[in-house]
Amino acid sequence: MEQYNVTGMSCAACSARVEKAVKKVPGVTSCSVSLLTNSMGVEGTASPAAILSAVQEAGYGASPKNASASKASDASADLDALADRETPKLKRRLIASLGFLLVLMYFSMGHMMWGWPLPHWFDGNHVAMGLVQLLLAGIVMVINQKFFINGFKGLIHGAPNMDTLVALGSMASFVWSTYALFAMTRAQVDGSDELVMHYMMEFYFESAAMILTLITVGKMLEARSKGKTTDALKSLMKLAPKTATLVRDGAEVTVAIADVQKGDVFVVRPGENIPVDGVVLEGTSAVNESALTGESIPVDKAVGDKVSAATTNQSGFLRCEATRVGEDTTLAQIIKMVSDAAATKAPIAKIADTVSGFFVPAVISIAVVTTIVWLLLGHELGYALARGISVLVISCPCALGLATPVAIMVGNGLGAKNGILFKTAASLEAAGRTQIVALDKTGTITEGAPRVTDLLPAEGVTETELLTLAAALESRSEHLLAKAVLADAEAKALTSPEVTDFAALPGNGLAAKLDGMDIYAGNAAFIQTRLTLPAALAQQAEKLAAEGKTPLFFGGAGRLLGVIAVADTIKEDSPEAIRQLQNMGIRVVMLTGDNQRTADAIGRQAGVDEVIAGVLPDGKETVIRQLQASGKVAMVGDGINDAPALTRADTGIAIGAGTDVAIDAADVVLMNSKLSDVPAAIRLSRATLRNIHENLFWAFIYNIIGIPLAAGLFIPFGLTLNPMFGAAAMSLSSFCVVSNALRLNLFDLHSTRHDHKTASPAAAPVQSAAENNKKSDAEAPEVKTEDNPMKKTLKVEGMMCGHCEARVKKALEALPEVDEAVVRHEAGTAIVTLNAEVADDVLKNAVEAQDYKVTDIQ
């Protein structure tokens, strides 16, 4: 996506105009314009010259963003681009405007209303009073000429905007007041004191100046608040190191960060920031990675561990090799991700975009009609104009245009601070609508690396003897489980002796000689070919297997020496994270390639709602497809084989420590690799959506109430609106919307206080996917295996509570072909386990006899 800076935009109508103009350029496939960041993202084959020309023809300015702006080495340039230059300019304009406005108000209202003294030469000189007011109002208009330049330019190009409304309102007040001044002068020449007083009451010079000043107040507050929405992005950019200490020819040399190349060796002392991504060659230390992950607890680093740019070396001296530099560093990628997300639009923004396209022309039409109607009702032109001007200046398309992007920007920034990165505005919106979360087991629910959990030595054998022998035998094996045994022996500082005649045997077994004694290891089936298992150990091993652990049997000299259990253990925060998801009304499904028995054990420990076992790597995408029939699905994974499922899901969530392929395929990236960040991400999305709805509500309600009030519809009830108060209301509307969005910065992502509570069904194994992996996508999703003859899923409407579930369950299980029915009113599903074929109509009739409606059977 090519990025451009856009100038001259003042409201949502402007951004809609630019977007519409660029989309008409041949070769442009998509265009997204951000009023908040005054930027534009364009995809397609169109040339930059054609795009810039289209923007200029629409009446705005544009320039390509520096291609290197996303590089960490040029973070200072990017930071400079985000600097708030608008607020100081508006502040200077406001101070100047206020100075002249106060003098104008003194002349126009102070003497008449409060008897404030005036220079004696103004006594009875009404023309002089009028000329002073004209001059002062004219000066305020010159100070705020930008409203007139942008407003009338937009009107000429057929794209009126907020500035057009302000310019028309202020100009109408000024022109009418100027006419009244000339008419009053003529009346004074003619000696008609009554007409002189009449026309003096028609002066609206103070309104012309007050409108501009109040709108400038609102613009300044809005600009200041908008500047705060990019604080998170600016703080990320400030983290980018400026220099690095390289080792060249045996000497340390300090160079600019832009000069660091991949493969360079750099050193980092305690207290220094790591300059680029790299791998530790020498030294140990604790590194604070909170800048990237939001996690304040330091992470221990040793030789071979990866380090990231902008993290802080806290304790030891590190010598590292650069692996990612410039725009490839983790920090640069995070900055780019947050920036790109700000340049995209959420689907919900289409509401405001649609309204903004016709809002300003509609307001101008309403103002004209209002003026004409009051004239036809017999009121004077000045009175009718006041009503029309009030309509112009109270209407605010800005609030509509800012309702969505400011909330998206703040939400994205808050997520980035906590190590949760949303790639687009659409993904931030979609995450909050999640109804089902599918979790890959390995590396997501579990640690992803097996470790020894139990040591069961046989009678007469110690744990140390068993582990020493096991390590000696497994030291020659490349199996993943062997590494777990070796790691446990190393952690206990055991030294394993050398073995000879090592062999990996068919049937998952190992054999070797240790000091002339035959030793062997393997699963239960293999070990029973060599010896007889003691009943007690066999029973214990069976219990371990039921818990999802893998028992490894070790023997020697014809007798069993013991059993070592190995398992991929559940992450400490996984059960709590899953419980939080369930309390948010989300169904949690675990996907795994393990056998059903192991999968069920892990599922029970984790507390998931459903377990789908036997899923081959290429079958995850099919499972996600099936789950989508029940609702919006978020897939959480970390491996290459998760990429198709992450892409297929409504929201793909990648664990940050996973593969680059998985991260590329995902919509959301969790830098912390903690499952507890999944409910936090959904919580943040829901809070952002709530904030957007609040903003849109107030923006619409403000205009729905304000425009009729300004037009005079409530005058019969004693309610009227002066143009000055209309301008004040308009100036505050955008400020209120932006301020409401900034409240998101106070939101606690990990607090469960506002979670929607719901009864969470107990963990239950659902189906084996062993056969399902072989099916094509077009086939029905019933799954048949030896243990699970057939399952069907019914979509049921009308269930509201646990009693409804019980009625449907009882009706289905009364059928002789149904062994079990798992019914959930939250998901609106009934999953039946069958022992024989049964027609769909039979199942449907059984449910509908209980006054519920079956909409689909799969």
Model-based region annotation:
Residues 184-188, 194, 209-270, 301, ...:
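Juxtamembrane coupling segments of multi-pass membrane pumps/enzymes
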Residues 113-127, 156, 175, 414, ...:
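Membrane-embedded alpha-helical bundles of multi-pass transporters
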Residues 89-243, 354, 455, 721-723, ...:
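Transmembrane helix-loop-helix hairpins at the membrane interface
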Residues 138-147, 154-157, 171, 194, ...:
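Hydrophobic alpha-helical transmembrane segments
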Residues 26-49, 202-203, 234-328, 425-470, ...:
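Conserved cytosolic catalytic loops of P-type ATPases
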